[in-house]
Amino acid sequence: MDFASRISILCFGASYAISMGAELLRFLWPHRWVRWIATSAALAGLFAHSLFLLHRGWIAQRIPIANQFESLIFVSWLMAMVYLYLIIRDRRLSAGIFVLPVTLSLVGMAAFITQNGDIADEDGTSVLSATHGLTLLVGTVVMVIATVVAIMYLIKLRQLRRGTVFSRVRLPALERLDRMNLAAVYLAWPLLTIGLGLGFMLRHLRVDDPKVITTLVAWLILTGLAHYRYQPEHRGQRVAILTIIAGIAVLVSFLGDPIFGTAHLQSPPTGEGRS
């Protein structure tokens, strides 16, 4: 683990930035070597990113998702894997210009957060606590994917209707994008529901905690979207817009700790239950 201990956010952040630059260049100049640079840089970044997380988990002897910094790093790692999966599955797909900005933004936010600034969950090694954190984070990633797919849907729709500056962007057919959106929404909802339910079961959450309020609001919006999507006739542009709204709500609940504050990770006074 000595080598892994020397890896910093700059290592994989720079790799993702190079990959993003190559994706933008590919948008203007679609040559094979540009795609190779984008893929290679992303693979190098994911390798360094994985070692960074493994080292942090090894040192702490737990899954590295116990505070805001680690959560940002973990979610950005999942998004990087999504990007690589998409471009390996379909080399012509313009996935990078949609997924990599999210990955880089999350890494950038983590870089400005003190790595040990949040108080880690004392029960972070328990199965239920780890499940609580993982289901919320994976559910957030799936909802981000649904939002990205919704944006792609709107761009594809505009391509078919008018043709725009994005005409060079290769996107799947509308029907496939709609199916991807449906699958992502139906996967995100149970994950976030389980994570939220475990959170209430494991902690005495305060209803006036901004973290709890924003998470509940996001869950209610997502629940409304999942119910709306259950109707077969509900699809198309309106569903895409509603998905983006729900995705923004989920992201606000995930990223809002430094802005709104929270008692979510703070230890209770001596002799009291955890909050």
Question: What are the residue ranges of the model-derived segments?
Answer:
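Polytopic transmembrane helical bundles with strong interfacial aromatic enrichment
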Residues: 1-275
